[in-house]
Amino acid sequence: MEIIFYHPTFNAAWWVNALEKALPHVRVREWKAGDNSPADYALVWQPPVEMLAGRRLKAVFALGAGVDSILSELNTHPEMLDASIPLFRLEDTGMGLQMQEYAVSQVLHWFRRFDDYQALKNQAIWKPLPEYTREEFSVGIMGAGILGSKVAESLQAWGFPLRCWSRSRKSWPGVESYAGREELDAFLNQTRVLINLLPNTAQTVGIINRELLNKLPDSAYVLNLARGVHVNEADLLAALESGKLKGAMLDVFSQEPLPQESPLWRHSRVAMTPHIAAVTRPAEAIEYISRTINQLERGEPVTGQVDRARGY
């Protein structure tokens, strides 16, 4: 059995060695331009069209939780990957815990008013502020997949009122579920902290815009952990200037790296990180990939396959 591997930044030699240890009966090679030799599986991130086009693969594994870069490429180069070839994404592989850490730490940061105290410190002002109550600090999660469920689970332990919004209704204990566009307004109007974990699809691009932000309570917060294209950055800045939003924490941006001229860099109520909220953990990823390949070879049911029509 042959596996081809491609990632523009990962240490390919390390991955090849680790995969061959996990799958001793398999030969793994780093794909390079001009390599047209047969392969059974491909492990990729932002692969060139020529890597996959025309191959009779058993499956392709994206080396991340999102597959939007591959699906976007397929829109313009449908020959890149035959529709009959299953496409898999990394389901969790350590990303759930990372998202939990990020979301909980940021919600608590806002809840305890550390941003306000930092602003006072910058002015050399000693001033205790009124506390927020949990009842007025409802957290709403857009996107109810594996990562969304993990974040909800971790926040529940801290006693915050929780709600989620997704394409279909969920039955999560202790979480109010809203589904579909017809219930979006009801979801938003009591959401003090909006956490975005939506997949990147044609339906979700630009969803966090002026219209949506205006439906949040005044002095709300936005935490974007999904994709930069979900947020209209000009509308977000306008909402911060008007006071509709009290703060924003952004891990992803419409253009990455974020251009130096972006006003987001200089806004006092915008905090940011460089797309590191949940990174691929190699050991966990290899365990999932090797297990799934073995299941596929035995004809057993598997999880993590992407529905190309839905985009996730």
From Swiss-Prot:
Signal peptide: none annotated. The keyword NAD applies. Keywords: Cytoplasm, NAD, NADP, Oxidoreductase. GO terms for cellular component: cytoplasm. The active site is at R227, H275 (proton donor). It is found in: Cytoplasm. InterPro entries: D-isomer_DH_CS (IPR029753), D-isomer_DH_NAD-bd (IPR006140), GhrA_Enterobacterales (IPR023514), NAD(P)-bd_dom_sf (IPR036291). It holds the Pfam family 2-Hacid_dh_C. It catalyses: glycolate + NADP(+) = glyoxylate + NADPH + H(+); (R)-glycerate + NAD(+) = 3-hydroxypyruvate + NADH + H(+); (R)-glycerate + NADP(+) = 3-hydroxypyruvate + NADPH + H(+). This is Glyoxylate/hydroxypyruvate reductase A. It comes from Salmonella arizonae (strain ATCC BAA-731 / CDC346-86 / RSK2980). The gene is ghrA.
